[in-house]
Curated annotation (Swiss-Prot):
Native source species: Imperata cylindrica
Subunit organization: Homodimer.
Disulfide bonds, paired cysteine numbers: none
Gene Ontology, cellular component aspect: mitochondrial matrix
Annotated keywords: Mitochondrion, NAD, Oxidoreductase, Tricarboxylic acid cycle
Binding site for NAD(+): 9-31
MF term (GO), any: L-malate dehydrogenase (NAD+) activity
The family this protein is said to belong to: Belongs to the LDH/MDH superfamily. MDH type 1 family.
Record-listed E.C. numbers: 1.1.1.37
Entry protein name: Malate dehydrogenase, mitochondrial
Compartment annotation: Mitochondrion matrix
EC main group: oxidoreductase
One BP annotation, GO: tricarboxylic acid cycle
Amino acid sequence: VAILGAAGGIGQPLSLLMKDDLFNINAGIVK
């Protein structure tokens, strides 16, 4: 999860394109 969160923080545009809620949540945790 931590790795996915780090990836989410770096690749927010990618997460938006994927529209993956879990990915977005992980990105939010990192920020």
